[in-house]
Swiss-Prot record:
Pathway: Porphyrin-containing compound metabolism; protoporphyrin-IX biosynthesis; coproporphyrinogen-III from 5-aminolevulinate: step 4/4. Belongs to the uroporphyrinogen decarboxylase family. The gene is hemE. It catalyses: uroporphyrinogen III + 4 H(+) = coproporphyrinogen III + 4 CO2. The keyword Lyase applies. It comes from Deinococcus radiodurans (strain ATCC 13939 / DSM 20539 / JCM 16871 / CCUG 27074 / LMG 4051 / NBRC 15346 / NCIMB 9279 / VKM B-1422 / R1). One of its GO terms (biological process) is protoporphyrinogen IX biosynthetic process. PANTHER family: METHYLTETRAHYDROFOLATE:HOMOCYSTEINE METHYLTRANSFERASE RELATED, UROPORPHYRINOGEN DECARBOXYLASE. Gene3D superfamilies: 3.20.20.210. The record marks D73 as: Transition state stabilizer. This is Uroporphyrinogen decarboxylase.
Length: 344
């Protein structure tokens, strides 16, 4: 497993070919996923280990992907801290008791995730025999402190994160306490995932691109640095990914992750120049291209591979999650194509 193409590349070593996996590779674009999810809520599937394990394995059984990513959601820890989470059709995740005041921060719990989310480790234990037999590593993941804080304050997804920024500016001490609580819970949660069998982890900072460089450095970087520092001690590669965050990449990369994720807005070679020497990079196809004609998908895949230029350390991925309308046969065809074109 340690010599898998994905793990070698995550460590910056040369692999026999460019490894491929996709964010949201276990998802609604797969008919078998829709069949298994029918009549079940998102949280029900996450909290039922045999369902979560099977969903994680579906794309691995269907396509020659180089890594599995645990079926989970970045918001899973929020209910264990005292926030009421629901997934509402047509809306997405909703927090029914969002954070409005410093007192709301102070009453948030910092639970031991082994006790409050035992289903996650059990899901991993159930799926590891299959992954081990295939030599496929598992990626565990969490949301980053800022992204979870933004959900907790906004109550749902937001375009501009006005409530989050107002709280951050008006209540800096409470904001620091909130970020510290998320740092502790998320570090503990990733520790449990690695102990159960994950051999790499990804930290999703989905909404960090809404921040200026100054605000990232002042209000977000300390807790995120603490999280990455704690997770690095687990001895597995750490991937750090933000959306719309090219302007933040030098600061994000300075936190010491092994791999930096890049979205599709910046050419891969330009993004690679923004990060630390020796860091690997992951990305960065626009996920909508998987719904384009093959000639265009092939053309832009060739462009990305040209930008990578055969350098060790490139993990091929989309620059955001796969969309529900994505044709599964295109995902399979693309995976095969990247493998064929990058044989070394």
């Amino acid at each position: 497993m340690r010599d898998s193409a994905f793990l070698k590349t995550a460590r910056g070593e040369q692999a026999p070919y460019t490894p491929v996996w996709f964010m949201r590779q276990a998802g609604r674009y797969m008919p078998e996923y829709r069949a298994l999810r029918a009549g079940k809520t998102m949280l029900e599937c996450i909290r039922t280990p045999d369902l979560a394990a099977e969903i994680t394995l579906q794309p691995i059984k269907a396509m020659p992907l180089d890594a599995a990513i645990l079926f989970n959601d970045i918001l899973t820890p929020l209910p264990t801290m005292g926030l009421s989470l629901d997934f509402v059709g047509g809306v997405g995740p909703v927090i029914h008791n969002p954070i409005n005041t410093p007192k709301d921060v102070d009453v948030l719990g910092v639970p031991a995730t082994a006790e409050t989310m035992p289903y996650t480790a059990e899901s991993i234990r159930l799926l590891m025999p299959e992954l081990n037999s295939r030599g496929i590593p598992l990626i565990g993941f969490v949301g980053a402190p800022f992204t979870l804080a933004s959900y907790a304050i906004e109550g749902k997804g937001s375009r501009n994160y006005e409530k989050t920024k107002r709280f951050m500016y008006a209540e800096p001490a409470a904001w620091a306490r909130l970020m510290g609580k998320f740092e502790s819970v998320l570090a503990d949660y990733l520790t449990e995932q690695v102990k159960a069998g994950a051999s790499a982890v990804q930290i999703f900072d989905s909404w960090v691109g809404a921040l200026s460089v100054y605000d990232y450095q002042t209000f977000v970087k300390p807790a995120t640095a603490g999280l990455i520092e704690r997770v690095k001690k687990l001895g597995v590669p750490v991937i750090y990914f933000g959306t719309g965050a090219t302007h933040l990449m030098p600061d994000m990369a300075s936190l010491g992750s092994d791999v930096m994720g890049a979205d599709w807005r910046t050419p891969l070679d330009k993004a690679w120049d923004l990060i630390q020497p020796g860091q690997s990079i992951q990305g960065n196809l626009d996920p909508l291209l998987l719904q384009a004609p093959w000639r265009e998908l092939k053309h832009q895949t060739d462009r990305i591979l040209h930008e990578a230029n055969g350098r060790p350390g490139h993990i091929f991925n989309v620059g955001h999650g796969l969309l529900p309308e994505t044709p599964q046969d295109m995902v399979h065809r693309l995976t095969d194509y990247v493998h064929e074109q990058t044989q070394r």
